[in-house]
Structures are given as C-alpha cells and as structure tokens.
C-alpha cells in the first residue's frame, strides 16, 4: 500500500531539492559554509593572467614542449543500456520530459530503499572481462557524499575501496595519419555507480533553472585509466576504443552527444627526467573525440607557458571546462580530495558476490572484441587503414564478415564497403543496417563482375539500386538485360561502325594523337549500353586502330 501511495504522489518543487536541506543544521552548514569554489576575485588573485602574443606563442611553444613530458589519465563514465535504473524500476529515456520518469528512490525520499538491478552486475562483469581486468568476487557499494542540487539523497551510491574490476588494459592501433603503431593503456579500475540528475537552464520552454531527476539513478560504469597517455591523439584514440568496446558488448550505445559516454581528462606536465608527477588538472565538458584532443593540446600549452615563465605555482589542482567556441579551458572549481567525499559502506545494499560459474558463463558469451577482430582482418591481408575502418563499427564488421562468408573475395568486399557503400551511407546519413542491400547480394554482385557476367560500371549502377530499393542481382540483370557482351564478333562490328562514323578522329589518332583511343572506347560502350566487355573491347579496338589502312 505504501508503495502505491508513493508512486502516485504529486511531485512538489521542494522535493526536488537535496535531502540534505532537511537534515540537521550542522550538516547544512558543513555543505554550504565549507565551499571549495573560489570567487572571481579569489581566482584573479591566485591565477594571474599571462599575456603572450600569438606570434611569440607559435614560435616558442614547439620548442618549449620538448622540454616537458605530458602525463594523461582519463576517467570515463559509461551509461548502461538497461531497461530500468540501477536501484529502482524507473525507465530512462534520453530527451524525455523533465521529472517524468522518477520515483521515491530516484528522489531520495525518506524510507525509499534501493534494490540492485542484476543487469548492472552482468554488464560490469562483461566490461571488466573485455578490458582484461581482474574481477573482485566480493565487492560492495559505498556512499560518496557531496552537496549539489541534482543529487537528491545528498550522496551517490558508488564503489570506493573494493571496485568490481581492477588491473586491466586495453589494446588499440593508432591510425596511419597519426603515425600508426600499436598501443596498450592500463586500466586502474572499473566500478559501478549511479548517475546524478541534471540542471536545466533557460531555453526550450524552461524559464529559469530546474532540477531534472530523470537521469538520477541511471546505472554507470566508471573506467579509470592508468596515466599512460602522452598526447591528445593517444587520449582521443583511447576514448574511441572504449566506445567501440561498449558497443561491441552491447552494454551501452556510447553516444557522447547524449552523455552515454563522458570523459574527464586529467593532464599534468613535468620536466623531462623528473620522476615526480606535476599538479594534475581535470578537464570536463568534452563532447567529442576531437574536443578531447584539442582540449589536451590547449592545456599542455597553458601549463608549459606557466612553467616557462616561472609561474608553475599557478597550476593548481582544479576542474576546468573546455569551451568549444573559445577553444580554451577555463576554471570551473577547485578539485575536491577523497576526504571531502567522506566515503563509507552503503548500509542499504548487501555485498556483491560473484561465483566462478557465473563469471565463466559471461566469459563464454562475450562477442569477438575490436582488438581480436583487427588482428583477424590483418591476418587476411588487409591494410591497417582497411582494418581500422571495417572494425570501427560492429554493424559494418558484421556486414563484411557475412559478405565474405558468402564467398566474396576479402579485398574486393572491403573495397565495395569502404568505397561506394560508405559514400552512400554518408550522403544519405544512414547506417549499414538501414540500407536494402544484403551481404548475400553484395557477394553475388562481386562474383558477377569477377565472372564477366556484367562490367564494373554496370555493377555500380546495380549496387545503388540494390542499396536504395533492394532486390537481387540476378533479377536486375535479367530485368534490365545487363548481361555483358563477350562475343568478339559482335564487339568487332560495333568497333567497325564507330571507326567508320568518325574518320576525322581516326586520322588524328593515326597521326599520333593516341589519347583518342578513350574516345573510341567510349563510343563503343555507349553503343553497347555499357555491356561490352572492357578487356575484349580494348583489345579489338587497339588492333583495329593500329591496323595498316
């Protein structure tokens, strides 16, 4: 009965404030008086602005950065694609009306107890195994305490000292345009936690600012990397590989624009040869892989300039925001320490206990992962450029695998998918799952061209019709009478006719203007409606053109 009453109660604006407002007075004072956010005046006093002309910066920066080593680590939050939230039965739909999918548990109301979604455990184990981590068979949840309007309970359910997975790594291949090569980056830990709500500001029908708790309680996996990256390109490629992994596993859609994959980057620099780490700065608001790269490059430049001007003390442990429009980072707040969060075990949830049998069952269900797929494609003889393109998207990789399973030659299948099919998808803004062409028909098309049944030109025309409308290769060839002409006598008649109709061009060719061979070939192809076998046509044409008159 109590549950029914809770689910049907009308939401009151006051209930959207953090429950810490209703706690004891001392607790409120702790959260408000001891604020770590500096005022604008304090920030100006602590971090004097450096004025460097663009000309001076561009000339000296490359030289200066060579004297420093950059240390980069990334904390990645992956929003899980579960049907319901982590600790209640509410669904989560991106873009839903504010506060339309909430309940007493999401809102942190007194007496509302969390119940763990088993899918969160399953997805955490999957990701831990995929990232080559050591799993904790016994782990627990903890309360991470901090004050913010979008955190209704006044704490976040997370994992502190015993995360579900530790000590892993991820392998990736850098694109050729970035120097290529294989990289391995360490994974410190993977832990489960719940998401917070979101502050919505003026715009889109909203006046002022409101707290939207739809996202509160949505399950997350936080992946903490080792500080193994040394530049923006490596960091961006690491994040892209994590996106590929979670999409291959099906644990998340990994869409950065929806907040399903959020990366917080920690950057510090130190003089070459120094073993002690420099002061790290956290960067947030990174909504794309390119913004990760650019934000890191800017932050490296900023810190190097401060060091070079004797103002390294101005580099403080803080959180900075990446401003896409201004292409720079700006101070958001001073960084909290672990002690500020006052972690302690979550009393309302039991320990998470995994059995070896459970882990083994998940291990056996894992799909082929991006790294394994890249090595398999490489062993097929494909170039690294081809490998990276095909393995980047799980749907494209599945389409390619299905095509070669139908007997298509590996390189030809890759060329068609990476060329005309990819161009069509880009122009029409569709995925490979949305086109009408099937792997079976692509394999049939490749075989028809290779077997001389149709020409490559006709093949392209058929391809675009198959992509847009579907159908079969054999059906279209028969319907449109597209079978290639391979009878030498028939092609010879067409060549003779074209030469007799163009005596002036024939005379010019025999006078030394040999580029006109292409003109004659084009005329014959036009007469045959593109059906003349190109190899046979060129052979007969050359014999006729070079024959003595």
Swiss-Prot record:
SMART domains: GatB_Yqey. The keyword Endoplasmic reticulum does not apply. Gene3D superfamilies: 1.10.10.410, GatB domain, N-terminal subdomain (1.10.150.380). Keywords: ATP-binding, Chloroplast, Ligase, Mitochondrion, Nucleotide-binding, Plastid, Protein biosynthesis. The keyword Flavoprotein does not apply. Its main location: mitochondrion. It catalyses: L-glutamyl-tRNA(Gln) + L-glutamine + ATP + H2O = L-glutaminyl-tRNA(Gln) + L-glutamate + ADP + phosphate + H(+). GO terms for biological process: glutaminyl-tRNAGln biosynthesis via transamidation; mitochondrial translation. It is found in: Mitochondrion; Plastid, Chloroplast. InterPro entries: Asn/Gln-tRNA_amidoTrfase_suB/E, Asn/Gln-tRNA_Trfase_suB/E_cat, Asn/Gln_amidotransferase, Asn/Gln_tRNA_amidoTrase-B-like, GatB, GatB_C_1, GatB_Yqey_C_2, Gln-tRNA_amidoTrfase_suB_CS. Its EC number is 6.3.5.-. This protein may be expected to contain an N-terminal transit peptide but none has been predicted. This is Glutamyl-tRNA(Gln) amidotransferase subunit B, chloroplastic/mitochondrial. It comes from Ricinus communis (Castor bean).
